[in-house]
C-alpha cells in the first residue's frame, strides 16, 4: 500500500488564542483504490508511518471520479499531456470532514469541467486556458472523469505579493484591470465565480494574470454548489470538543 500524501492538522484554539497540533491525515493507495486514515501522532515524514497501527478507511470510487454519461460533451485533454500543463485532480487530503464538498470531491471536478466547457468556447486572456479533461473507463467500461488539464502558470497573485520585496514591484493598476476584465467576461457569460481571492489568480513571468479555479462557479442567480468562498478544504470546521475549532492543514515533511 502506497502512501500518497500526509499532512498535519493544526487547530486554532480560541481559549489558547493559538494554533495547536490536532492530528495527521494520511492518504493511501492500493492499485486503483484509495484510502484515508487519521492519527493523533505528529508524523513528519512518510517513513515514520506504520500503516498497521492506523485505522484505514476506503474512499469510495464514486466520491472521487464521477460517471460521465456522454463523453462527447467534454473536451478531452491531449494525450500525452504537454509538459507545461497543470493537472487538477480531486483533493483527497480533506476527505470526509464536515462539508459535503469534502465527501464528494469528484462532484467538484465534474462541475468544474462543465463550467470549463463554456469557457473554452468563450476564451479570454484573463481567464485560465483550459486544455480538456481526462476520461478513463473503469472495470465496467463506464467513463469517469479523472482530472482537468490547464496551461500552467508561474505563481499565484498571493505568492507574487508575498515575494514582491525581492522582485520588480507589481503594477497594481494593471493587475486590477486584468481581474476586472476577466470578471466582466465571466459575468457576460452569465457566470459568477464565487471564490475570487489572491490564490485563485495566477501570473506568468511578465505579470500577465488569469483567473482560475471554477469549481465554485455557478450560473447567475443560481444556488451555491458544494463549494464556495474560503470554506473549500483549506479551512474545515470540526468539533472534537464542545467548541468549534478551525483546522489548518500543513504539509508534513518528506522523507
Stretch-by-stretch model annotation:
Residues 32, 37-118:
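ATP-binding glycine-rich loop module of kinase domains
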Residues 204-255:
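C-lobe/activation-segment region of protein kinase-like
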Residues 179-186:
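Conserved hydrophobic alpha-helix
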Residues 95, 105-106, 120, 128-171:
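Conserved structural core of kinase catalytic domains
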Residues 16-34:
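Short, hydrophobic/proline-enriched secondary-structure or compact coil segments at domain edges
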Amino acid at each position: 500500500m502506497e502512501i500518497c500524501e500526509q499532512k498535519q492538522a493544526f487547530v486554532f484554539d480560541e481559549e489558547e488564542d493559538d494554533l495547536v497540533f490536532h492530528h495527521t491525515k494520511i492518504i493511501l493507495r492500493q492499485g486503483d483504490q484509495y484510502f484515508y486514515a487519521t492519527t493523533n501522532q505528529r508524523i513528519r515524514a512518510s517513513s515514520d508511518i506504520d500503516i498497521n497501527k492506523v485505522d484505514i478507511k476506503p474512499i469510495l470510487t464514486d466520491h472521487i471520479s464521477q460517471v460521465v454519461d456522454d463523453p462527447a460533451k467534454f473536451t478531452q485533454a491531449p494525450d500525452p499531456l504537454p509538459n507545461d500543463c497543470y493537472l487538477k485532480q480531486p483533493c483527497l487530503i480533506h476527505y470526509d470532514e464536515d462539508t459535503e464538498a469534502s465527501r464528494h470531491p469528484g462532484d467538484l471536478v465534474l462541475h468544474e469541467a462543465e463550467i470549463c466547457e463554456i469557457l473554452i468556447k468563450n476564451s479570454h486572456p484573463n481567464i485560465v486556458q483550459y486544455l480538456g479533461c481526462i476520461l478513463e473507463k473503469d472495470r465496467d467500461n463506464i467513463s469517469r472523469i479523472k482530472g482537468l488539464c490547464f496551461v500552467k502558470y508561474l505563481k499565484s497573485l498571493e505568492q507574487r505579493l508575498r515575494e514582491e520585496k525581492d522582485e520588480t514591484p507589481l503594477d497594481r493598476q494593471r493587475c486590477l484591470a486584468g481581474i476586472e476584465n476577466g470578471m466582466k467576461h465571466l459575468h457576460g457569460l452569465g457566470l459568477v465565480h464565487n471564490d475570487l481571492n489572491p490564490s485563485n489568480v495566477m501570473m506568468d513571468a511578465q505579470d500577465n494574470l488569469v483567473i482560475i479555479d471554477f469549481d465554485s462557479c455557478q450560473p447567475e442567480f443560481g444556488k451555491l454548489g458544494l463549494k464556495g468562498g474560503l470554506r473549500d478544504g483549506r479551512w474545515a470546521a470540526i468539533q472534537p470538543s464542545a467548541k468549534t475549532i478551525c483546522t489548518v492543514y500543513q504539509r508534513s515533511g518528506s522523507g
